[in-house]
Amino acid sequence: MKTFMASPATIDRKWYVVDAEGKTLGRLASEVAKVLRGKNKAIFTPHIDTGDYVIVVNADKVKVTGKKLDQKIYYHHSDYIGGMKETTLREMMNKHPERVIEYAVKGMLPKGPLGRQMYTKLFVYAGPDHKHAAQKPETLEF
């Protein structure tokens, strides 16, 4: 018996919608990353993108534990000398709540071209509405 290896032509992708309201950030992100990678499928192949599309709604209502709202800091650089910028989780949730989930999930995906391809199948929205009704997404519960 040979080991099954999926090929891009044999992959059947589904669309899932996840409601982030009341869910803990890290636990939600790890489950979403598993679906994006395809680890929940029997045909998972490490070097092929076998994952499904995931839509996350209500990103502004995700919860975090402890003092992370004030102590978790996101860093970025302006490419100028002394241009290190920092933003707390509270500021990020007020300005761009969808980026919080995007950064958390992106950090849990493989680094490299395959991980970047998987990341393109993630869609995050701050409110309860999304523009992917034509894909008929199924609700995914964790």
From Swiss-Prot:
Pfam families: Ribosomal_L13. SUPFAM superfamilies: Ribosomal protein L13. It comes from the Bacteria. One of its GO terms (cellular component) is cytosolic large ribosomal subunit. GO terms for molecular function: mRNA binding; structural constituent of ribosome. Gene3D superfamilies: Ribosomal protein L13. Keywords: Ribonucleoprotein, Ribosomal protein. InterPro entries: Ribosomal_uL13, Ribosomal_uL13_bac-type, Ribosomal_uL13_CS, Ribosomal_uL13_sf. One of its GO terms (biological process) is negative regulation of translation. Part of the 50S ribosomal subunit. This protein is one of the early assembly proteins of the 50S ribosomal subunit, although it is not seen to bind rRNA by itself. It is important during the early stages of 50S assembly. NCBIfam families: rplM_bact. Belongs to the universal ribosomal protein uL13 family. HAMAP family: Ribosomal_uL13. This is Large ribosomal subunit protein uL13. The lineage of its organism: Bacteria, Bacillati, Bacillota, Clostridia, Lachnospirales. The gene is rplM.
